[in-house]
């Protein structure tokens, strides 16, 4: 198993920090090769937020203390909020690659809402190197702790949020475009066959 993790002040302690609007406390990545299983079980959740990005393979999540797993495939993100139970597993057979970040702050809920991250737990975000690059940049910043690293961490995480927001809007526009195209096709059909008996089922397949 490959791991590359970073922690604010080298501390793995769960924390809630209300001193700033957004604070990144830890981030990292896991890639399973030979280790059969990597489970996580936090019955009481955590005090902070956690965002996970499934970059490859898939992961098994148990939401709302459900024994039955929800399979989350590559190209999706999972968002845990404070005190939400966290139970999930990665399996080597799934060739799972995941990136994660924990964050807190005094304005996180409003910030997430402004980017379209509502009360859903699983978000489709698409695949590509952009997300991996941003997570890797956060890991490096938190490991090196150079001047201004806390601000850089916030900038990288906000870029992830912005990319998610753009993906949500482009997906919505795509769905709307498809719907408008179907409406146009139906109107054309009615105009061409106005003097004939109309079969609604036939129209739906034109």
Model segments located where?
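Amphipathic alpha-helical segments enriched in hydrophobic/aromatic residues interleaved with Lys/Arg
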Residues: 110-175, 188
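Conserved metal-binding segment of the jelly-roll/cupin
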Residues: 72-85
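Short helix/strand-capping hinge loops at secondary-structure junctions
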Residues: 193-197
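Ligand-binding loop in jelly-roll beta-barrel domains
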Residues: 83-107
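Conserved small/polar residues in nucleotide/adenosyl-binding loops
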Residues: 205-206
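Generic protein-terminus/edge-of-domain signal
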Residues: 1-71, 92, 115, 119-122
């Amino acid at each position: 198993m490959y791991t590359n993790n970073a922690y604010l002040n080298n501390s793995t302690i769960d924390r809630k920090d209300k001193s700033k609007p957004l604070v990144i406390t830890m981030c990292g990545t896991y890639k399973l090769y030979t280790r059969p299983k990597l489970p996580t079980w936090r019955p009481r959740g955590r005090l902070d937020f956690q965002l996970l990005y499934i970059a490859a393979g898939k992961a098994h999540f148990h939401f709302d203390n459900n024994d039955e797993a929800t399979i989350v495939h590559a190209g999706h993100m999972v968002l845990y909020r404070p005190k939400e139970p966290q139970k999930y597993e990665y399996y080597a057979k799934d060739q799972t690659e995941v990136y994660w970040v924990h964050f807190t702050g005094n304005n996180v809920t409003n910030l997430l809402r402004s980017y379209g991250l509502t009360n859903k737990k699983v978000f489709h975000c698409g695949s590509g190197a952009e997300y991996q690059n941003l997570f890797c940049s956060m890991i490096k910043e938190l490991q090196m702790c150079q001047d201004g690293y806390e601000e850089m961490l916030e900038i990288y995480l906000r870029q992830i949020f912005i990319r998610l927001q753009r993906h949500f809007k482009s997906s919505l526009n795509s769905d709307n475009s498809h719907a408008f195209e179907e409406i146009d096709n139906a109107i054309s059909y009615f105009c061409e066959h106005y003097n004939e008996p109309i079969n609604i089922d036939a129209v739906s397949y034109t």
